[in-house]
Amino acid sequence: MRDARTARADDYGLARLKVSASPLYLREAEVRRGVDLLQLGQSHLLRAIDPLLREAAIGRAHYRMLGHVTRWPGLAMGDLIDLSGTSKQALTRVARELEERGLILIAPGLLDRRRRELRPSEAGTALVAQLEARLAAVMAEAYAGAGQDAVTGFWQVLEGLVPVASRIRMAEWERGR
């Protein structure tokens, strides 16, 4: 018999379990359940890339920054601080470590030389592609089990968690590509 760490969903008859939110979905217990599931889901999702992160000698914070820099090349440190809510000190340390490992390039801005812009290196872009392929496989499996309507609802909830100002900035960065 497997323990909870090695059990498959089918062992518990959960593979096709469909859950439905209570009509009282704004009650504290329901909201807490959503927070718990979000945190647990994120933890398990990121475990899929932990072996690649260890191999690259970087952590999850490094991956988050590298992912943003790859998605929006030319972001400044200030942009990343606004996006992530992380302190300048913490981001500077992570950026320096990524630069030392040859995964990002930090250079003065093209229009404003005081602005430090971050861009992925070829190695950084290749690593992000590997990491995101693993994450996509895990997400695709979860999406397939949930269905299109559930995925749409999930996206709506996640977008609701991102402040409007951040969503606007992200859209601007997308257009600026």
Report each predicted region and the residues it spans.
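Residues at secondary-structure transition points
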Residues: Y25, A29-R32, D36, L40, ...
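DNA-binding alpha-helical recognition surfaces that contact promoter or target DNA
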Residues: R93
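N-terminal leader segment of winged-helix/HTH proteins
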Residues: M1-A56
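N-terminal helix-turn-helix DNA-binding core of bacterial DNA-binding proteins
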Residues: D36, S43, R47-A90, R101, ...
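Charged, amphipathic alpha-helical coiled-coil/dimerization segments
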Residues: Y12-G13, R96-E159
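Membrane-interacting alpha-helical segments
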Residues: S20, V31, L118, R175-R177
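Short, charged, intrinsically disordered terminal tails
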Residues: L26-R27, P163-R177
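Hydrophobic alpha-helical core bundles mediating ligand binding, dimerization, or RNAP-core interactions
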Residues: V31-L53, V128-G147, V151-A165, R169
